[in-house]
Curated annotation (Swiss-Prot):
Enzyme superclass (EC): transferase
Source organism of this protein record: Tolumonas auensis (strain DSM 9187 / NBRC 110442 / TA 4)
Localization annotation: Cytoplasm
Gene: lipA
Name of the featured protein: Lipoyl synthase
Main subcellular location: cytoplasm
Amino acid sequence: MTKPITVQPGVQLRDADKMALIPVKFLPEQEGEQLKKPDWMRIRLPKTDEKIQNVKNIMRKNNLHSVCEEASCPNLSECFNHGTATFMILGAICTRHCPFCDVAHGKPLAPDADEPKKLANTIREMALKYVVITSVDRDDLRDGGAQHFADCIREIRLASPNTRIETLTPDFRGRMDKALDVFRETPPDVFNHNLETAPRLYSMARPGADYAWSLKLLQKMKELHPDLPTKSGLMMGLGETNDEIVQVLKDLRAHGVTMLTLGQYLQPSRHHLPVKRYVPPQEFDELKAIALDLGFTHAACGPFVRSSYHADLQAQGQEVK
């Protein structure tokens, strides 16, 4: 009989331990069962890792986290080599346990009250002109962590007034009104919240989340700040159909979203949701054309695209794929 998983405060649960807590069960893949990666999914590594190590050292020195490392992003080498990173606030332990995500699950510790200042000082030290701030889900906090986001935005603007700030937030489920009240006074320059996948796959891929709730959050933020660009992202390769993706795009536009990212899902380990298929680059191009026809002003679509991948270029409307 399998020993029950005990969740202790501050302890990170990953892979099999994390998946054991998910209500929708699936068997981990065995060796040889994974789909073979096509040639277009091969990553070119930089010739030297000096810049990569420099970014990591700065993060360690200030006791900060990057979603690039915590979520095992395939673009880590490229982004760190360019001196950029997506900062993950509110700790490295998520209260959700989505089976596509490599971020650790568990009972997080109290937020670090000094994190906003440390984050702002780090961004100033790195001389960043565009930053993306994301977080784990914090269902244990009364406002879902919204005030911590606002504190970070405020400190960054004090330290680096010319730096543009994009926030990639959780859904603040059950706490939307409190979160919106916080963002009313301290909005970012771009507000991003990912739908991740088609609603049919939510019970499997996003347990604890709600498709309509996420759409409402995006809509409410746009209503509060009509000139604020709102953004959302989707993964492909989880078993969705292209027709389902197009319907999600229509739903996003109906809720005022103007910026879009579409990328290929990659399985972090054999314990995570398997890749159902690798979507060829030409399909991403076709979906981008549909997105632009639907009225999206920005659409970054390609196998390696992630929400924060070259987010500064995305915001400028440049080609990212």
